[in-house]
């Protein structure tokens, strides 16, 4: 558990930036930190932490699904110049991209979990650390999908229409 807290603090101090866009921001960490701080009391059961993290993951997963759905619907409704509705090529590319990201997210969180003494999700501490990783990765992907719709000229977006 303490390894994760050190990892989390490392992520906070080594935030990555793309132009002025924050890839991992304080909001990503604050909800996770709040859940982990519930364990500051020695009497707190790790299942309280796990339950808190699971609720947060369900919330960020719903936000991801909303952002993905918005990008998908935009491609359906506003095809690229010279392409007729529906733009099946771009829809298929978005689906492939999302599947590839899901695979990346799972592998990335496996990598994080590999640092644990018990690398099994049946262990409540390991599952809590895995959920923390899933939250961070999911928030990052959600922001990326949102940038597609809200991009300026500096950010390449598959949803830019000319």
Swiss-Prot record:
Listed name of the protein: Uncharacterized protein YecT
Family per record: To R.meliloti R02472.
InterPro entries found in the cross-reference section: LprI-like_N
Gene: yecT
Native organism: Escherichia coli (strain K12)
Family annotation (Pfam families): LprI
């Amino acid at each position: 558990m303490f390894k994760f807290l050190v990892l989390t603090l490392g992520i906070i101090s080594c935030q990555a930036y793309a132009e002025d866009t924050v890839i991992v921001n304080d909001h990503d960490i604050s909800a996770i930190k709040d859940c982990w701080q519930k364990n500051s009391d020695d009497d707190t059961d790790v299942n309280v932490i796990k339950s808190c993290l699971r609720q947060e993951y369900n919330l960020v997963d719903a936000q991801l699904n909303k952002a993905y759905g918005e990008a998908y619907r935009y491609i359906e409704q506003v095809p690229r110049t010279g392409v007729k509705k529906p733009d099946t090529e771009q829809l298929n590319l978005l689906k492939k991209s999302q599947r590839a990201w899901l695979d990346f997210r799972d592998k990335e969180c496996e990598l994080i979990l590999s640092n644990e003494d018990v690398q099994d999700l049946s262990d409540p501490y390991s599952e809590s650390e895995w959920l923390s990783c899933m939250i961070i990765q999911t928030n990052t992907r959600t922001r990326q999908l949102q940038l597609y719709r809200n991009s300026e000229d500096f950010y390449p977006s598959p949803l830019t229409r000319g």
